[in-house]
Regions:
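Glycine-centered positions within short beta-strands or beta-hairpins
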Residues: 18-24
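Short, surface-exposed, charged amphipathic helix/loop patches that serve as local interaction elements
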Residues: 2-13, 25-103
Length: 103
């Protein structure tokens, strides 16, 4: 059974490099992280798809901020927004896709 998946295995944090050239860690996506993302964004993940359709950039910035806030609580949302260019948005799209897959 080589393809067996260990559902208890801990997911490793990911890192992204933002426009300031610094590497930032993204937390593993677990229940606490997801709950904190909802709290930070002010809406449940069930509304994420419609929010992305209606307010794409605002919602993307909120997701990225919520993720970074887990590891870097000193960042504020405007600061995070200034650190994100289209290049950075594409580099974290996989993580955002993982979150959306759960909704």
């Amino acid at each position: 059974m080589e393809n067996e998946v260990n559902i208890l295995a801990e997911e490793k944090p990911k890192s992204i490099t933002l426009s300031d050239g610094k590497e930032y860690k993204l937390p593993p996506i677990d229940m606490t992280t997801l709950a904190n993302i909802e709290k930070t964004m002010g809406f449940g993940l069930g509304k994420l798809q419609s929010k992305l359709e209606d307010e794409t950039i605002t919602t993307m910035r909120s997701i990225i901020y919520a993720l970074l806030k887990e590891v870097q609580p000193d960042l504020d949302i405007d600061e995070v927004g200034h650190l994100i260019t289209l290049k950075e948005m594409s580099s974290i799209s996989e993580t955002i896709s993982e979150i959306m897959a759960l909704t």
